[in-house]
Each structure stands twice: as C-alpha cells, then as structure tokens.
Amino acid sequence: MTYTVIFSTAAEADLFAIYDYIAERAGAGIALRFVESIEVYCLGFANMPERGLRRDDLRPGLRTVGFRRRATILFEVDQTARRVVIHGVYYAGRSLEGLEESD
C-alpha cells in the first residue's frame, strides 16, 4: 500500500533556497536537475517510507536520510493517515541544532 508524500511549506522553501544557491554558482540547469532529483527521491517514500535514521532526540517521530552526500532530508511517517511529511531539506552541512525547538 502506498503513502501520500507531502512537502511542508518549510521544505518547499528549502528547495527554492537550494535552487537559488546552486543556480548562482553552477547555473540554472544544474540547479533544476538537482532539486528535481531531490523531489523524485522524496516521492519514492510513497512506496518505502520507513527508511533513514530515526531522530527522536530532535523531535519524536522525525527521520533523516542523506541525499547524495550533499543534503539531509527531514521527514515524518504518519502510519494512521498513510502519509509522509517532508519537513525540510538541509543542504551542504546546514546544522540540525535547535530543530527540536522549531515547528
């Protein structure tokens, strides 16, 4: 059975910021391909949501998974609603510190 994958407003903002960052340094085409590849990877959680590392130390139910050694995807699996919520995409070593205090 598949899950619905939802990108939070914060995750969408992260993807736009990643696009802008890469586009300034490497061009719009490369930025677009990278961001689209993150989105496709996240949509894959629909079939296999229980991957990554549980990070209950940051927030109960939170999971993280690396993407191409350049980004960390933060997400939560809601078994009851059969959905995966992507909470954020941290690029190039952005710190997870203080996450437990944010929404």
Task: Name what the model sees in each region.
Residues 1-35:
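Arg/Lys-rich, positively charged N-terminal/basic patches that mediate binding to nucleic acids
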Residues 31, 53-55, 98:
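Short, hydrophobic secondary-structure boundary micro-motifs
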Residues 69-72, 76-103:
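Enriched for short, Lys/Arg-rich terminal
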Residues 48-83:
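Basic/aromatic recognition patch in beta-strand/loop cores that engages polyanionic ligands
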Residues 27, 43, 47-51, 70, ...:
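Generic structural signal for secondary-structure transition and capping sites
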